[in-house]
């Protein structure tokens, strides 16, 4: 049996609990009474946050059992899907975590079939890499994240505030290039950023935020990407969409799913043209085997392949 605990599996946020017979949802008190010899794993949405940590008691309990954790998060490819439409949405499902560096997905060297299906369903086009000569009309697009999001755990746990990291990264970019910098705030959490401080750093702040939903930035992201010479981020999932658009990306943390097809230091920004030639093919195939529909999750194939450690 795979146990979900109300709270660490966040039903109130709109997550849908699997209806396969192997899954059981209960409250925390009931979970503590379970015979752990009959529990194979736990299922949760997201992970415990360095800031969002109000479910720490549940996560500590699950940790102490030593059981595997199936972690459900938003999909790797998010274009044209909507979290509020679960019947057509995809979800990333990993073992013990959801990030590129800590999650286990058994997806290395995956075949092409799943990518071909997702590409068609989500209408994703893989555009050639932009080898764009910088003329002064383009900009470095700095993709920001929700300041309290669990994707920033590695930064926050190291004792660095995200605001401070943003300011330092802008200064670090300035130390290697005088190219224009445009900031794209997280569309859902614009009010969580200190716009006054950002304005003092001489950067442009995007005003393109129309059309987003809980899964993606909508058309506004593509408007910002249109004249982007390159992107910089800690680990934003928008970098995945940028890479599909052919925009070179500097990812500054290895938790980002676009890490294998991106640069990892800012010095590349000193060039007038980035000759970006990462091969994205196998990366696309592998990413496709991290995300699943609710129908697939309910069929049992997803948890079986994770818990069995293979592609069953």
Which residues does each predicted region cover?
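N-terminal pre-catalytic "stem/leader" segment of glycosyltransferase-like enzymes
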Residues: 1-49, 149, 309-312
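A donor-sugar binding/catalytic signature common to diverse glycosyltransferases
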Residues: 45-47, 53, 216-263
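Active-site donor-nucleotide binding/catalytic segment of nucleotide-sugar enzymes
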Residues: 130-190, 282-295
């Amino acid at each position: 049996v795979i146990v979900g605990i109300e709270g660490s599996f966040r039903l109130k946020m709109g997550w849908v609990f699997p209806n396969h017979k192997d899954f059981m949802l209960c409250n925390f008190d009931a979970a503590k009474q379970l015979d752990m010899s009959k529990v194979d794993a736990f299922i949760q949405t997201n992970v415990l946050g360095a800031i969002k940590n109000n479910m720490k008691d549940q996560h500590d309990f699950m940790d102490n059992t030593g059981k595997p954790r199936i972690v459900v998060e938003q999909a790797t490819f998010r274009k044209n899907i909507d979290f509020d439409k679960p019947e057509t949405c995809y979800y990333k499902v990993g073992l013990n975590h959801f990030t590129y560096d800590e999650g286990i997905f058994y997806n290395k060297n995956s075949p092409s079939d799943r990518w071909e299906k997702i590409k068609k369903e989500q209408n994703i086009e893989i555009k050639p890499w932009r080898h764009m000569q910088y003329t002064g009309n383009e900009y470095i697009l700095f993709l920001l994240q929700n300041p309290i999001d669990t994707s920033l755990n590695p930064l926050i746990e190291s004792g660095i505030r995200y605001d401070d990291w943003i300011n330092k990264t802008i200064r670090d970019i300035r130390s290697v290039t005088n190219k224009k910098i445009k900031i794209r705030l997280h569309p859902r959490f614009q009010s969580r950023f200190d716009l006054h401080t950002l304005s003092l750093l001489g950067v442009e702040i995007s005003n393109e935020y129309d059309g987003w939903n809980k899964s993606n930035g909508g058309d506004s992201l593509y408007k910002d990407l249109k004249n982007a010479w390159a992107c910089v981020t800690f680990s934003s999932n928008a970098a995945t969409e940028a890479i599909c658009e052919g925009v070179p990306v500097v990812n500054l943390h290895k938790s980002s799913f676009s890490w294998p097809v991106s640069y990892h230091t800012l010095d590349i920004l000193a060039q007038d043209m980035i000759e970006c030639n990462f091969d994205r093919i196998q990366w696309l195939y592998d990413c496709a085997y991290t995300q699943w529909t609710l129908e697939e999750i309910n069929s049992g194939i997803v948890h079986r392949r994770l818990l069995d450690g293979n592609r069953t």
